Amino acid sequence: MAQTDILLTKEPAPQTVPACQLPRKLYDVARNTGAHTSSGLATSGFRTAKYLLDEWFQNCYARYHQAFADRDQSERQRHESQQLAAETEALAQRTQQDSTRKVGERLQDMHGWKSELQRQVEELVSETELLLAQKQRLERALDATAGPFSIVTDNLQCRERRQHPDLVRDCVEIELLKEAELIRNIQELLKRTIKQAVSQIRLNWEHKETCEMDWSDKVEAYNIDEACCRYNNQSTDVQFYPHSAKFEESASTPETWAKFTQEHLYRAERERLASVNLRNLIDCILQDTSEDLRLQCDAVNLAFGRRCEELEDARHKLEHHLRKTLREISDQEHNIAALKQAIKDKEAPLKVAQTRLYQRSHRPNVELCRDAAQFRLASEVEELNLSLAALKEKLLEAEQSLRNLEDTRMSLEKDIAIKTNSLFIDRHKCMAHRAHYPTVLQLAGYQ
């Protein structure tokens, strides 16, 4: 018979007596009515209290058989129990190892997604910081345009103080109006770009927070699974949770779990690329706007330079004509004085001639003769009158010419003053103010 502490690996050999439950059998004992009765005549017809020898043997055999059957059944049950315990132990070990392996694989998957989320968050943070720097460049560039706009507005207002006929729509004013329109357009463009950058920064932060929340959930789940992976049969912090094997209705599937994170990564990467494209666009915008402003500034300065040269040349010519006019006025004044003196000089000869004629008109009788002297005196008076008339007419012409020269002098002096005022406005007001125009680096938002 096998020992109880030995594990049987095969079925036991069949015994002599089959291992089955034997039915109990009732034996009818015959009444002892023979001569060997022990009860005498008083017990005639009744069984005695003693068993027969056969009954005794049969009873012993029945006890032997029952003991053997019970032992055999117990041994078989022990063998089956030991085998079942070994099988369940092996199964438990296999399932636990498989569960641990599955949890480990899950840890690897979560670590991979967690790393991707962390990388995406870091890239989004880095990209958002770069975009914030570009936004600050836009704001500095927008602030830098306030100076040029103030300059061009002041130039236009200053040039409105020019006097006629210099108050003209010249090339300088055309370039200034172009510059003012360009600055307004650039300011509107920069404002729109700043709004776009602010919106993109907000989207970047939103997707960063979404990835951070997903990353945080995965870190928490990773820590839970990592703790679960360390559990073993010797752990002291394990206990029974009868209802833990029930699946939650809100639980996700591996496909939806992976798709959930993939969507977050895809959207975050899409916004990151949009942010990169926006940064490149901002670079191009700032470079183009700063170059356009400087080119237009140079065009305005060139127009101012040409206009100042034109005004300077016109003033020099006016001053030259003024000098000639002044000389001519002086000469004309001397001429008028000479004419007046000539007229005055003709008065004495005319008086003499007229006095002679007058005195000779008092000659008596026949002496009042139209002699040659009389004719010569008459012609002398006529000649003197003609000379005086010519001199007076020439004097009137000279005086009118002098008045015209004076008017011309006044006009020239006024024009020279106007040109001087225009030069002062353009050169000392406008161009001096334009010397404070921002640099390209300031217009590009670097300073």
UniProtKB/Swiss-Prot annotation:
Keyword presence, Cytoplasm: yes
Protein's GO biological process: cilium assembly; cilium movement involved in cell motility; flagellated sperm motility; regulation of brood size
Annotated Basic and acidic residues bias: 72-81
Tissue-level expression: Expressed in trachea multiciliated cells.
GO CC field: axonemal A tubule inner sheath; axonemal microtubule; microtubule cytoskeleton; sperm flagellum; sperm midpiece; sperm principal piece
PTM comment text: Ubiquitinated, leading to its degradation. Deubiquitinated by USP16, promoting its stability.
Feature: compositional bias, Low complexity: 82-97
Keyword Cytoplasm belongs to the record: yes
Coiled-coil annotated spans: 69-144, 304-423
Key words of the record: Cell projection, Cilium, Cilium biogenesis/degradation, Coiled coil, Cytoplasm, Cytoskeleton, Flagellum, Ubl conjugation
Cellular localisation: Cytoplasm, Cytoskeleton, Cilium axoneme; Cytoplasm, Cytoskeleton, Flagellum axoneme
Location of the region described as Disordered in the Swiss-Prot/TrEMBL record: 72-104
Function: Microtubule inner protein (MIP) part of the dynein-decorated doublet microtubules (DMTs) in cilia and flagellar axoneme. Forms filamentous polymers in the walls of ciliary and flagellar microtubules. Contributes to normal sperm motility.
Family membership noted in the UniProt record: Belongs to the tektin family.
Quaternary structure and interacting proteins, as annotated: Microtubule inner protein component of sperm flagellar doublet microtubules.
Descriptive protein name: Tektin-4
Organism: Bos taurus (Bovine)
Gene responsible for this protein: TEKT4
